[in-house]
C-alpha cells in the first residue's frame, strides 16, 4: 500500500514537471488577421498566460508570432490563435517548434 501511494505521487509530479517544461514556437496565422486587433489581443492573452515573446504583421497579410513559456500555456495560446479576437477570421495556423532560449521576458507587439 505504501509503495502504491508513492508511485501515484511520483507519477503526478512527473506530469506536473512536463507541463512546466519551457516550450518555444513560431506561429504564422493567415486569414483576416490584420486590422482586427489580433496583435494587441495576442499580447493581452500572452501576458495573462505568462507567455513571453512577440507578435508582428507581415507584408503578405499574415501575422507572425513567437511564444515561449510553460508548455501548457504556450499550447493554450496556440489554440487561441485558431480563433483569434472577435473580428478576426482565421483561415490557417502554422506552428514551428524552436529550441527554447530560456531568456525571453515580457511580450512585445512589433
Curated annotation (Swiss-Prot):
Residues 24-110 form the Acylphosphatase-like domain. The keyword Ribonucleoprotein does not apply. It catalyses: an acyl phosphate + H2O = a carboxylate + phosphate + H(+). Transmembrane segments: none annotated. Its EC number is 3.6.1.7. Keywords: Hydrolase. PANTHER family: ACYLPHOSPHATASE. This is Acylphosphatase. The gene is acyP.
Amino acid at each position: 500500500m505504501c509503495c502504491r501511494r508513492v508511485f501515484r505521487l511520483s507519477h503526478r509530479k512527473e506530469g506536473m514537471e512536463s507541463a512546466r517544461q519551457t516550450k518555444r514556437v513560431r506561429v504564422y496565422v493567415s486569414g483576416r488577421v490584420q486590422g482586427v486587433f489580433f496583435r494587441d489581443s495576442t499580447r493581452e492573452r500572452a501576458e495573462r498566460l505568462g507567455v513571453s515573446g512577440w507578435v508582428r504583421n507581415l507584408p503578405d497579410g499574415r501575422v507572425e508570432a513567437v511564444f515561449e513559456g510553460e508548455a501548457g500555456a504556450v499550447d493554450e495560446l496556440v489554440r487561441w490563435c485558431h480563433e483569434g479576437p472577435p473580428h478576426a477570421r482565421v483561415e490557417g495556423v502554422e506552428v514551428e517548434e524552436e529550441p527554447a532560449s530560456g531568456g525571453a521576458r515580457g511580450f512585445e507587439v512589433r
